[in-house]
UniProtKB/Swiss-Prot annotation:
A GO CC annotation given for this chain: cytosol
Residues annotated for NAD(+) binding in this entry: 218-220, 283-288, 304, 360-362, 407, 486-490
Alphabetic keyword roster: NAD, One-carbon metabolism
Family: Belongs to the adenosylhomocysteinase family.
Sequence positions that bind substrate: 192, 217, 247, 251
Protein name listed in UniProt: Adenosylhomocysteinase-like 2
Co-factor note (free text): Binds 1 NAD(+) per subunit.
Gene3D superfamilies referenced in this protein's UniProt entry, alphabetically: Adenosylhomocysteinase-like, NAD(P)-binding Rossmann-like Domain
Gene this protein is translated from: AhcyL2
Entry-linked InterPro entries: Adenosylhomocyst_ase-like_sf, Adenosylhomocysteinase-like, Ado_hCys_hydrolase_NAD-bd, NAD(P)-bd_dom_sf, S-Ado-L-homoCys_hydrolase_CS
Originating species: Drosophila melanogaster (Fruit fly)
NCBIfam families: ahcY (TIGR00936), PRK05476.2-3 (NF004005)
Record's function text: Might play a role in the regulation of methionine metabolism.
Gene knockout outcome: RNAi-mediated knockdown results in extended lifespan with increased fecundity and suppression of age-related decreased climbing activity and intestinal integrity. Does not affect oxidative stress resistance. RNAi-mediated knockdown in fat body or neurons does not show any phenotype. Simultaneous knockdown of AhcyL1 in intestine results in extended life span.
Superkingdom: Eukaryota
Length: 492
């Protein structure tokens, strides 16, 4: 792991009026927004909209702009309201926007982004623009986009290519449109899963040579970066924000702890008390899921390959098992490993009738969904993102979000914890852009000082007051009174 040099930063419109013709419709739709956030289980638009691919529906925003592709630009007013609600719960990124917008630290930065497109990510995108960057954006997941939010970004003049329910072909088309545009060339990548990085490296190698740096926020994407580095193919510096303290210990853990319950409730109406659940993986995602479900009265089992994580699970009160020991009896299976084929067709053949199966990891390959597309099995879509899959003997399992990331496909997430991660991403982009040549072609972690700065941006929300070291104490501990307060090897 390369050591990252010390940072010097911060020493540190109107919608189409034909969309809403009656006040009663307007009230109902705004009510839908406030309660559902245009997530997968809620607003989907009219049947006409569902039948037409956005690729074939040429639209203009109120300024006449056409450099975008979203489901329906007419929903921009609803999306703007969602973004404003998120802003009120994202103190860190909003404070960063206020403090740095006059300096324009990203002036000249051309950022291509491939992340989830929801209200929280929209706050980050618009912050990057206010800090001086030009951006082009696509979604990293075909089911997590909030269509109204994408419309609001398009209305604001941001080139955004994303809608909920993209096909695989449309996904890559959108990402290609985000990367390539006449007269525009990216010099920074903000990635979630590594798809933008790999598409650019494969299809636009000349573009990739001009990249100043990559910021990656997911376990899957970070793994892909390290594989590139190991193979000598990573020719630009990259920052792994997934393993920064503020991302890993706050966004990853707390977001998953809250959203797993929301996802399961919205899609299945399950009562948790007494249900047997197996969590595959006990990293920060698995820890959050296990703790949350245990708190609701579930009997929780954990599977792990890492003896350290397994010991943590055991001492947290969970029984550590092999999947084959419990697969016939559990009511819910949750994957949280980032690995491949964690749940195989053989596992699914042995699940009990009515077993709920979902994935909380970024990778869509944790569950062997392709193995379920065989002639003898019957698929029935019973709700948005809820499929009943029936075996010839009448047994049925419930698959959520087709094995993709369930919390962002089937529910909403906490804006506050996303603010922590978004602040980290913004600072990482600023650092890479403002210090060309400082970093070699390697994968870096954020310095402790930057992590502490991000945390400090969020303390005022809780009226939290930090204790200050005396001169005697700082000398005794060998610390600067202004931080950093922990060594890089410290594990929180």
């Amino acid at each position: 792991m390369a050591k990252m040099p010390e940072t010097t930063f911060a020493d540190l419109s109107l919608a189409d009026k034909t969309a809403v013709k009656k006040s009663s419709i307007e009230a109902r739709r705004f009510s839908d927004v406030s309660t559902c956030s245009f997530s997968s289980t809620c607003f989907t638009g009219s049947s006409d909209e569902e039948d037409v691919s956005p690729k074939d529906n040429h639209q203009r925003n109120s300024a006449g702009g056409t450099d975008f592709c979203v489901k329906s630009i007419s929903k921009s007013a609803f999306g703007r309201r969602e973004i404003e609600i998120a802003e009120s719960e994202m103190p860190g990124i909003m404070t960063l926007r206020k403090r740095a917008k006059d300096e324009k630290p990203l002036k000249g930065a051309n950022i291509v982004g491939c992340t989830h497109v929801n209200a929280q990510s929209a706050v980050l995108i618009e912050t990057l623009v206010q800090l001086g960057a030009t951006v082009r954006w696509a979604a990293c997941n075909i089911y997590s986009t909030q269509n109204a939010v994408a419309a609001a970004l398009a209305e604001a003049g941001i080139p955004i290519f994303a809608w909920r329910g993209e096909t695989e072909e449309e996904f890559w088309w959108c990402l290609d449109r985000a990367i390539y545009s006449d007269g525009w060339q990216p010099n920074l990548i903000l990635d979630d899963g590594g798809d933008a990085t790999h598409l650019m490296l494969k299809k636009y190698p000349d573009y990739f040579k001009a990249i100043r740096g990559i910021v990656e926020e997911s376990v899957t994407g970070v793994h892909r970066l390290y594989m590139l580095s190991k193979g000598g193919k990573l020719t630009v510096p990259a920052i792994n924000v997934n393993d920064s303290v503020t991302k890993n210990k706050f966004d990853t853990f707390y977001t998953c702890r809250d959203s797993i319950l929301d996802s399961l409730k919205r899609t299945t109406d399950i009562m948790f008390g007494g249900k047997q659940v197996v969590i595959c993986g006990y990293g920060d995602v698995g820890k959050g899921c296990a703790q949350s479900l245990k708190g609701q009265g579930c009997i929780v089992y954990v599977t792990e390959v890492d003896p350290i994580c397994a010991l943590q699970a055991a001492m947290d009160g969970f029984r550590v098992v092999r999947l084959n020991e419990v697969i016939r009896t559990v009511d819910v299976v949750v994957t949280a490993t980032g690995n491949k084929n964690v749940i195989t067709r053989d596992h699914m053949n042995r699940m009990k009738n009515g077993c709920i199966l979902c994935n909380m990891g970024h990778s869509c390959s944790e569950i062997d969904v392709n193995g379920l597309h065989t002639p003898e099995l019957t698929w029935e879509r019973v709700r948005s993102q809820v499929d009943h899959i029936r075996w010839p003997d009448g047994r049925m399992i419930i698959l959520l979000a087709e094995g993709r990331l369930v919390n962002l496909s089937c529910s909403t997430i906490s804006s506050f914890v996303v603010s922590v991660a978004s602040s980290t991403q913004a600072l990482a982009l600023i650092e890479l852009f403002s210090a060309p040549g400082r970093y070699k072609s390697d994968v870096y972690l954020l310095p402790k000082k930057m992590d502490e700065y991000v945390a400090s941006l969020h303390l005022a929300t809780f009226d939290a007051h930090l204790t200050e070291l005396t001169d005697e104490q700082s000398k005794f501990m060998g610390l600067n009174k202004a931080g950093p307060f922990k060594a890089n090897y410290y594990r929180y």
